Amino acid sequence: MKKILKTLALSLLFIPFIAGCKAPVFYEIMRDVAPEEATVNGVITSITRYKFGTEEKLVTFSSDGLIWKDAAGTAHGQWSCFPNSNQLSGKIIKTAADKSNLYVVTITFHEDVEKGLNLPDAATLWWYDNNNEKWSEVSTPELLPGNFNIFCTNDVDNDNRSAYLRIDDKVYKLNGKDFPTSEKTTGNYNSVVSGDIFFESTASVKNGNYIYWGEGSKLYYSNDTSNPKAEGKKTLALDAGTDISCLAVTSDSILIGRGDFSNSLISKGGIAKTSLKDGIPGNSLESFSTNATSQLASVYQIYTLLVADPNETELNASIYASMGFKGSGSSTSVSYDNIGLWSYYPARGNWNRE
């Protein structure tokens, strides 16, 4: 049985992140470009590959709700509202898909007047019925209070797509509207269970015969897809300087999203990259030939990265990244106008708002 990498996140991604900004380096400022009209705003924690009939789509969410576009789209402004997404109640915090189904998790909140906070009240897993174009709630065990997350392989090959729901140390493989009656128990968050690989890191990606993942600020890789973290199987590639929050690959590069998600109010992260040759990553960070580091700068956090076609080179691929920052932003050169999704398209030749 083909072993497919599954990413296991440790915590619920509904922390109130905020975004923005530009690097204060003269050289980078000179490479800045006029901003496109922002069409996808808000804190975005996932961009999901989804096959709708015969069409390959990308699905994400914004402050306006659930949106999608053709995966082959290579221009600004192509996102549109997902069908009947007004049937969803609550704030969307995550999307996921397997080879046949699309899933969304929403959160409802209540106001704590004494504390002046909006606190999470309940979480709901939704399933989209392709045939009837309607959303239905999936009857799950209670998700809040507790630790849970939805995640998926997000593989380019639709046959390799699987989606999972983790509730504490139980992992359930999703399969449409009916919640599974069996689960996999992970004794720890770096385990192999029934041939499925689960990582504690949200930053992991598989490309060909290699797996790449982040542990803190360090990037590791392995060509042992059955148990890549086993003793003697993993290799340290480099230290990215700041905790690695997400990864994406092209044919010639590994793109590294960074973000400090500790309790510190100092916001730091930004995008970085290293080379990729015959599956082996470089041993140091390398400079971009685009304006990536001036737009996705080190004063904010990168939440997610996606390369539409990993077989393309970095300069010939359509690439998406979402970003944000923590704290008030008053002590750093950030802008609330930059919250949301950013993209690189070959025809445009630079990173800009999506």
PLM features per residue range, with description:
Residues 21-45, 49-53, 57, 63-161, ...:
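Trp- and S/T/G-rich repeat-edge/linker motifs of beta-rich repeat architectures
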Residues 1-22:
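Sec-dependent bacterial lipoprotein signal peptides
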